């Protein structure tokens, strides 16, 4: 069978394996690459290649992550797998690996375990939109009723955290048997790949989303007006369009009268580009770093939100001591720090370095935010934590 060459035209989807320690996440990752390479072409990756995950830094936090790639006939997948539970927590909170969908691995021999629940909750908090279940080690369970029971438990757990438990694809398989080349179990890996293709919708590309540019710098150019610079995070801004300036102060409207990149004039700025945007009638002192330029009505400023945060351990250069309620650090959003106060969950007195925790934050100035926005927690310019907006309150 001839191997197809990698087509850049295929939609690109980001996924990852999540689930309890030793339920077979890494074995499944190896099995997917192996079976799909054999079936559709591409590179197989061995278990020990994946298990030996390199360390990366995201927002000053060290995370071990393995990245593999595989293809189905219709899509190209980038897949992340983490060796340790702490790596998952950090990865999901920092958004180091944005997932369009996740494969939840549950050993049929054990059923749902504490980290199964924690990973589903994290998925909900950080905005993983779709979860597919792979019931692993099914070759070791002879009793059909037991499999039914485990499947039911997993579906109920998903529903508890507002995932559609009843409609979630659940594939029963054995990653190890598939990896060993047993055709009956290889077929289950193909079934999983087909579920990825059909159940996870094609992600909306950044360029198709509403325009947003976090402002990094502001200049005034005599005779031409005020220019803001930054990297377009999403969408497109065209010359002549109205834009809003959102965050820190009251929202104002203005018009984009020019876009330039590397001193050349353009008619638009697109997602991923570093541009200068010329604004009509806006004075230099009415706009500042930390605000965003956005398509009118697409994003609102907020001060209060629920978040999921990871507090760096001492070894990661974080705090050496716990903090308590009333803690007032800076919250770094996109390009600027804003001071905020925290409220800890009922019954939690203190937070230790290395913990992950849900907390309610109230900022002293509003920031343009949506659910899923990432931030760093800093003290005097040094990062002590990372977080994600789980729910906007006010």
Curated annotation (Swiss-Prot):
It is found in: Cytoplasm. Residues 10-204 form the tr-type G domain. SUPFAM superfamilies: EF-Tu/eEF-1alpha/eIF2-gamma C-terminal domain, P-loop containing nucleoside triphosphate hydrolases, Translation proteins. GTP binds at residues 19-26, 81-85, 136-139. GO terms for cellular component: cytosol. Its main location: cytoplasm. It is an enzyme of class 3 (hydrolase). Mg(2+) binds at residue 26. Belongs to the TRAFAC class translation factor GTPase superfamily. Classic translation factor GTPase family. EF-Tu/EF-1A subfamily. This is Elongation factor Tu 2. The gene is tuf2.
């Amino acid at each position: 069978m001839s191997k197809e060459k990698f087509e850049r035209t295929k939609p690109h989807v980001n996924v990852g394996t999540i689930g309890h320690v030793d339920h077979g996440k890494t074995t499944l990752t190896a099995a997917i690459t192996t079976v799909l390479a054999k079936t559709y072409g591409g590179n197989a990756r061995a278990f020990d290649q994946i298990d030996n995950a390199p360390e990366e830094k995201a927002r000053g936090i060290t995370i071990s992550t393995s990245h593999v790639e595989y293809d189905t006939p219709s899509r190209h997948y980038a897949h992340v797998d983490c060796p340790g539970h702490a790596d998952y927590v950090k990865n999901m909170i920092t958004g180091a690996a944005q997932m369009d969908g996740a494969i939840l691995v549950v050993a049929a021999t054990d059923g749902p375990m504490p980290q199964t629940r924690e990973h589903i909750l994290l998925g909900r908090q950080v905005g993983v939109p779709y979860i597919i279940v792979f019931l692993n080690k099914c070759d070791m369970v002879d009793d059909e009723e037991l499999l039914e029971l485990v499947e039911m438990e997993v579906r109920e757990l998903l529903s508890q955290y507002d995932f559609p438990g009843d409609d979630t694809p659940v594939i029963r398989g054995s990653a190890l048997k598939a990896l060993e080349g047993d055709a009956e179990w290889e077929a289950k890996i193909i079934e999983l790949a087909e579920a990825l293709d059909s159940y996870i919708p094609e992600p909306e590309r950044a360029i198709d989303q509403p325009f947003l540019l976090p402002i990094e710098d502001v200049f005034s150019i005599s005779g031409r007006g005020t220019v803001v610079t930054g990297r377009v995070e999403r969408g497109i801004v065209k010359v002549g369009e109205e834009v809003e300036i959102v965050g820190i102060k009251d929202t104002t409207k203005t018009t984009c009268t020019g876009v330039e990149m590397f001193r050349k004039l353009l008619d638009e700025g697109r997602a991923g580009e570093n541009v200068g945007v010329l604004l009509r009638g806006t004075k230099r002192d009415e706009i500042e770093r930390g605000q965003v330029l956005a398509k009118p009505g697409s994003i609102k400023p907020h001060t209060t939100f629920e978040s999921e945060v990871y507090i760096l351990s001492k070894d990661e250069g974080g705090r050496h001591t716990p903090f308590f309620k009333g803690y007032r650090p800076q919250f770094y959003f996109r390009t600027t720090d804003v001071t905020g106060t925290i409220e800890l969950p009922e019954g939690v007195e203190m937070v230790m370095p290395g913990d992950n925790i849900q907390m309610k934050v109230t900022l002293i100035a509003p920031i343009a935010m949506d659910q899923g926005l990432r931030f760093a927690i800093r003290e005097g310019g040094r990062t002590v934590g990372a977080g994600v907006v789980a729910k906007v309150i006010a």
